[in-house]
Curated annotation (Swiss-Prot):
Modified residue annotations for N5-methylglutamine: Q251
PROSITE patterns xref list: RF_PROK_I
GO CC list: cytoplasm
Record-linked InterPro entries: PCRF, Pep_chain_release_fac_I, Pep_chain_release_fac_I_sf, PrfB
Key words, A-Z: Cytoplasm, Methylation, Protein biosynthesis
Main location: cytoplasm
Protein family membership: Belongs to the prokaryotic/mitochondrial release factor family.
Reported function: Peptide chain release factor 2 directs the termination of translation in response to the peptide chain termination codons UGA and UAA.
GO molecular function, one term: translation release factor activity, codon specific
Name of the protein this chain belongs to: Peptide chain release factor 2
Species the sequence originates in: Campylobacter lari (strain RM2100 / D67 / ATCC BAA-1060)
Localization of this protein: Cytoplasm
Modification after translation (UniProt): Methylated by PrmC. Methylation increases the termination efficiency of RF2.
Length: 366
């Protein structure tokens, strides 16, 4: 990097931060935080626990956004002033230190961008994730299991908590189906980028001839809905089946019909839950999963209508990413058009940067 390149980088980052400021309006955030502070000082505020909780979440979200903005704004100003001073004094060591720190400065601006992109209505919610292997038997089941592990490792890295709702093992390897709840700040905001078809190309460990195989698995992500959101489901539109739980689950497995499957006929959506010994609790969870899926489906329809000139790529049936393990190693996302060679790291849950690239690319297309 030289002086010209660094000057151009500062210009680009200042322009980006300026654009972000025009969108998030920091002064309005400060005014709203002051307003919330005054509300919290009123004794009557805490009498409505539900409303207090909603405002508390808003306060946390906009406080974090303002903090990220101020960190980025101050760091950029400091770097710019130091660069000008170092140039005027011909301080080559300081200039080189600024060059070396340039990637960190860029990361700070990206962090601000992501904070802005995760300020949507549902982004702060928990996420319900389901993984379904495509056709292909053992090979696809194993791929679904690899994706499941990838998301579990991602959740560990991000400090998200995971609760398994339904798990069905494959006959020889992998899994037939898994659904799980991810709890944490912006869980849905991040994981919504995983909605779609994931493609794997590799030499199959299950093929004695060592041939190359292509497998597919679909990932479906929906926000966990608050209880106050009304989703109407008519009895005539659903079929409820009860069956014995399978897979890991202790001594009660296969002894009682505690597992629940709900089929929503108009949409074709099927959800199932065998997480609990209680059929009643599993049924309640399955209904919650169904409501979240129907809500997500409605969001997708609205997205399609908003992009009527060009059908939206956000959907459960669209191939979003390819993971190639043979004859070369690469993970490529079709939405951001970014390619990554650290395949092992990605399959071990290092997917945050890839997800952030998708969120930024999708915002640029809006």
């Amino acid at each position: 990097m030289d002086n010209y390149e660094y000057s151009e980088l500062l210009k680009k980052l200042k322009n980006k931060v300026g654009n972000i400021a025009s969108i998030i309006k920091p002064e309005e955030i400060k005014a709203r935080l002051k307003e919330i502070e005054n509300l919290e000082n009123s004794p009557s505020f805490w009498s409505d626990v539900k409303q207090a909780g909603i405002i508390g979440k808003e306060k946390t979200k906009i406080s974090n956004l303002l903090k990220n903005y101020e960190n980025a704004f101050n760091a950029l100003n400091d770097a710019s002033e130091l660069f000008d001073l170092a140039n005027s004094e011909n301080d080559l060591d300081t200039i080189q230190a600024l060059f070396d720190d340039a990637p960190n400065l860029e990361d700070l601006i990206v962090s601000l961008e992501i904070s802005m992109l995760l300020s949507g209505e549902n982004d702060g919610k928990n996420a319900i994730v389901s993984i379904h292997p495509g056709a292909g038997g053992t090979e696809s089941n194993d791929w679904a299991s690899m994706l499941y592990r990838m998301y579990l490792r991602f959740c560990e890295r991000e400090g998200f908590k995971v609760e398994t709702l339904d798990f069905q093992e494959g006959e020889e390897a992998g899994l037939k189906d898994v659904s799980f709840l991810v709890k944490g700040e912006n869980a849905y905001g991040y994981l919504k980028a995983e909605n779609g078809i994931h493609r794997l190309v590799r030499t199959s460990p299950f093929d004695s001839a060592g041939r190359r195989h292509t497998s597919f698995s679909s990932v479906m992500v929906s926000p966990e809905l608050d209880d106050d959101i009304e989703i109407e489901i008519e009895d005539k539109d659903i079929r409820i089946d009860y069956y014995r739980a399978s897979g890991a689950g202790g001594q009660h497995v296969n002894k009682t019909e505690s597992a629940v499957r709900i089929t929503h006929m108009p949409s074709g959506i099927v959800v199932q839950c065998q997480n609990d010994r209680s059929q009643h609790k599993n049924k309640a969870t399955a209904f919650k999963m169904l409501k979240s899926r129907l809500y997500e489906l409605e969001l997708m329809k609205q997205q399609d209508e908003a992009n009527s000139s060009e059908k939206s790529e956000i959907g459960w049936g669209h191939q979003i990413r390819s993971y190639v393990l043979f004859p070369y190693q690469q993970v490529k996302d079709t939405r951001s058009n970014e390619a990554f060679s650290q395949v092992d790291n990605i399959l071990d849950g290092d997917i945050k940067k890839m997800i952030e690239g998708v969120l930024i690319a999708q915002k640029a297309q809006d």
